[in-house]
Amino acid sequence: MKILVSNDDGVLAPGIKILANELSTLGEVKVVAPDRNRSGASNSLTLTQPLRVKQLDNGYYSVDGTPTDCVHLALTGFLEPIADIVVSGINEGANLGDDVLYSGTVAAAMEGRYLGLPAIAISMVGDNIQHYETAAIIAKQLVIKLSANKLPSQTILNVNVPDLPLNQIRGMQVTRLGTRHSAEPIIKEYDPRGRPIYWVGPPGIEADAGAGTDFFAIKTGHVSITPLHLDMTHYKLFDHLSNLLNEICIEN
């Protein structure tokens, strides 16, 4: 088995090394990841400048681009042969609910799926992560399962793991995305020259975090596994929208 590993925390982040080492027992692992932390990069591609790649002493490839750049590069000509599966992570922090819209970790998995491969995004939930090995072992088990049981097309798995020793994990739950309240206001500061600068505010607190959500699974000590569908079309709205549009008269 050939496995492509990427992330958004950067090629030197502890999570990606632990993940790659664990997955190496299953086959050939190639690591292609950003040269620095690119958290929040979402699905962005670099289109206005070339990408530069450096191979590190440990064999990992460092890319001066986004997580999506890394996976796109790896699967469209940089790596030969291409991988059988993409695993993104282990992210240092949660990717729950609305987080997936901004997450470079999830985006790297999405890019793998866009390019035809099964893909998993895996994140650790906690403030000071101590148990990356737990997530690495869970990722390995999921890769084994997916090698024999293919996911439907247009689908990835978003996996969140409590920062606990493996023997304290209470099980796995298939979940839906919860939601957060709106983000906190921006933070305004001033640089040494007195000019205003702005920081994006913290994420909002949980809004929909009841039973069945990814938030709830984590709170109860379970691994949250949320299947995400890349086709974002809202099919149930078709009839209503068609009726609405029929009422609009377009005249030349």
From Swiss-Prot:
It is found in: Cytoplasm. One of its GO terms (molecular function) is exopolyphosphatase activity. This is 5'-nucleotidase SurE. Nucleotidase that shows phosphatase activity on nucleoside 5'-monophosphates. It comes from Legionella pneumophila (strain Corby). Its cofactor is a divalent metal cation. Belongs to the SurE nucleotidase family. SUPFAM superfamilies: SurE-like. It comes from the Bacteria. GO terms for cellular component: cytoplasm. Its EC number is 3.1.3.5. It is an enzyme of class 3 (hydrolase). Keywords: Cytoplasm, Hydrolase, Metal-binding, Nucleotide-binding. It catalyses: a ribonucleoside 5'-phosphate + H2O = a ribonucleoside + phosphate. A divalent metal cation binds at D8, D9, S39, N91. Binds 1 divalent metal cation per subunit.
